[in-house]
A protein has these predicted regions:
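Extracytoplasmic
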Residues: 3-28
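Residue-level signature of mid-helix packing/kink "hotspots" within the transmembrane helices
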Residues: 13, 49-58, 142-143
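Extracellular/periplasmic helix-loop-helix junction of adjacent transmembrane segments
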Residues: 20-54
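Conserved MFS/SLC helix-loop-helix module at the cytosolic interface between two early adjacent transmembrane helices
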Residues: 55-91
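MFS 12-TM fold signature
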Residues: 79-84, 103, 168-172
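Cytoplasmic helix-loop-helix junction between adjacent transmembrane helices
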Residues: 93, 99-137
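Helix-loop-helix hairpin linking two adjacent transmembrane segments in secondary transporters
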Residues: 95, 124-129, 133-181
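Juxtamembrane intracellular "pre-TM" segments in multi-pass secondary transporters
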Residues: 181-195
Length: 195
């Protein structure tokens, strides 16, 4: 679970250090006219990811409550693998922007459901340690992963950072499948908006 939160930290924040590289590559006409405008336009990749988080967190968490948590976590980590791999291969700014929005969708649900899974795995008296363990991946990502991803992206092309992130999520998917215990869903649980 912490491996996935490490990947989430990387995919969310590595873009910031690579905006000039991304803008130069996928917005060449804008870059030729104004580098500042190209970087500002590339900044939409950050905004669209954040929008995906806002839309996806409550939607996915609500829908996923009915299904076994280990399967939901596998699905979320798989989605993060695929959407980051798409960012690596897609040729145009518009398609990359769409992949960034899609990559943001599982973000909040991964943290929310992952924290519940970790708390259940450790049981009473150690639930907070389980939640902290999941969030440790995010902390380590901000200290190690993002600078490393930015360095790799600047040295070998910005896309390498996203295939690295996709690889991290692939590893997270495998470890979740192997080590997260089965937990039944709650078929009766739904989201309601009372007001």
């Amino acid at each position: 679970l912490a491996i996935g939160s490490f990947g989430i930290g990387m995919t969310e924040f590595v873009v910031m250090g690579l905006l000039p590289d991304i803008a130069r590559d996928v917005l060449p006409a804008v870059w030729a006219h104004s580098q500042d405008d190209a970087i500002a336009q590339a900044g939409w990749l950050i905004t669209l990811y954040a929008l995906g988080v806002v839309v996806g967190a409550p939607t996915i968490a609500g829908i996923a409550a009915r299904f076994p948590r280990h399967l939901v976590m596998i699905a979320l980590a798989t989605a993060l693998t695929v959407f980051n791999a798409l960012t690596f291969v897609l040729p145009s700014f518009e398609l990359i922007a769409a992949s960034r929005f899609l990559a943001g969708l599982p973000h909040g649900a991964y943290f929310g459901i992952g924290a519940l899974v970790a708390a259940d795995m450790l049981g009473p008296g150690k639930r907070a340690q389980g939640v902290a363990f999941v969030l440790t991946g995010l902390t380590i990502s901000n200290v190690v992963g993002v600078p490393l991803g930015t360095f790799l992206g600047q040295q070998y092309g910005w896309r390498i950072a996203f295939i690295a992130v996709a690889s991290i999520f692939a590893l997270a998917t495998i470890t979740i499948a192997l080590f997260v215990p089965k937990h039944p869903g709650d078929p009766g649980r739904t989201i309601t908006l009372e007001g």
